[in-house]
């Protein structure tokens, strides 16, 4: 089964690219391929001139730091055993040499940017509404200050009244 065939695009810095199509056409698969969550069976994938399909540790590290994804289901994408602070700090722990205090400061700053309160830092995902969980997922996707954020229907699971608020 071919999920994607003949897909080609260039994303310019500072621009938004929307991939539109009917259910099952491969939009989510494309997002997972771009982040290498799934490995392409063919084709090419370049980021800033680097072939991301080569098994080059530098290219893999670059991809992890500069290309992030926000999944459409915040219920399934947040580890229920970790507190919000841990969830947000994890990308920094893996990809930077920041101290524990620096990671905490960055996590708290990002929480403020997405409209979460300081006291939410020590709470678990199940303690939040769908809109708040999606804000946590968005915050996690932005923690490494990526160049590219792939948003896989980031508000599809939310009530219409909450969608605009989360997107803003």
Regions found by a protein language model. Name each.
Residues 1-168:
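ABC transporter nucleotide-binding domains
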